[in-house]
From Swiss-Prot:
Transmembrane segments: none annotated. SMART domains: MATH. This is MATH domain and coiled-coil domain-containing protein At2g05410. It comes from Arabidopsis thaliana (Mouse-ear cress). Residues 6-132 form the MATH domain. Pfam families: MATH_2. SUPFAM superfamilies: TRAF domain-like. Residues 227-291 form a coiled coil. Keywords: Coiled coil.
Length: 303
């Protein structure tokens, strides 16, 4: 387990307007001894949103040691090359694990905003700046190990998922039989993206309130709302999120009360320390008072 520093990555997406719905990826880079890449959906993972989706992704996650985890904070900025003040910035943080290795923003910016605000697209290029801060790493990747060019996927109820995700996806369908009864997306890339986001969301909501920040819960709410709009039936997950928000409120309330009680207790603690000090002094005086007198001390001194 280790704490690492942050790194800033700039990714220039060329010929943006000609890109289709398939996901695109930045070059792989290393932060904190871990491989990362930025993943984007030029048309969004839900066409109804008409948006640009942006995520941080762990590549070659199948090659990572069992039990690996990494906690990262990412800040994505879409650079407005005409005016820096108009640049769009969003921040999130997430525990990346074997079954939830992608996290970010289904709606980083809408196409309407991209086209309306002059300066984002210059000569057909969109500039993305990502600041990645790896907060904690459990189980390091050997970055010298070559990545496998082919990643095997398995079909589970019409979704192409990685072997490490199969059990989690099967459990989702077993416990929620109608989860995709009204799911609208047909594009296989977009379906995979939605499933990855859903798995990341379920992993997030399984964390303790202590591990989750209010910003993290807010991000989870945005991701959940987005997934619901694709037609996924996630009533049970909404309930889970509400319960987690309530537990977070209780946790914060308890912390406030504990701090208040501790502040109230401080004067008494100081008083107790003062009394203990007085008791020690009194005991010393008591021992001195109980010392027997020697009748010969004065005689010896006079001789």
């Amino acid at each position: 387990m280790e704490t690492t520093v942050d790194t800033t990555i700039t990714w220039v997406i060329k010929n943006f307007s000609s890109l289709q719905s398939a996901p695109i990826y930045s070059d792989i880079f290393v932060v904190g001894g871990c491989k990362w890449r930025i993943m984007a959906y030029p048309k969004g993972i839900n066409k109804a949103h008409d948006s640009f989706s942006l995520f941080l992704n762990v590549p070659d996650n199948e090659s990572l040691p069992t039990g690996w985890r990494r906690h990262a904070k990412v800040s994505f900025s879409l650079v407005n090359q005409g005016s820096e003040k108009l640049s769009q910035r969003k921040v999130t943080q997430h525990w990346f694990v074997q079954k939830a290795f992608t996290w970010g923003f289904p709606v980083m910016i809408t196409h309407t905003e991209l086209n309306a605000k002059m300066g984002f697209l210059v000569n057909g290029e969109l500039k993305v700046v990502a600041k990645i801060e790896v907060l904690e790493v459990v189980g390091k990747l050997d970055v010298s190990k070559e990545s496998s060019p082919i990643m095997k996927t398995i079909d589970v109820n019409g979704f192409q998922v990685l072997p490490s995700q199969v059990d989690s996806v099967k459990r989702l369908f077993e416990k929620n039989l109608d989860i995709v009864s009204k799911f609208r997306l047909k594009n296989p890339y977009l379906k995979t993206a939605c499933m990855n986001l859903l798995l990341s969301l379920t992993e997030t909501l399984c964390q303790s309130p202590q591990e989750l920040s209010n910003d993290g819960l807010s991000d989870a709410g945005v991701a959940l709302a987005y997934l619901i709009e694709t037609g996924l039936k996630l009533d049970w997950l909404e309930k889970k999120l509400d319960e987690l928000k309530e537990k977070k409120k209780k946790e914060e309330s308890c912390l406030v009360r504990l701090r208040e009680m501790d502040e109230q207790l401080q004067p008494f603690k100081k008083r107790c320390l003062d009394i203990e000090d007085q008791i020690s002094k009194e005991k010393e005086e008591l021992l001195a008072a109980r010392e027997p007198l020697s009748l010969y001390d004065d005689i010896d001194n006079n001789v």
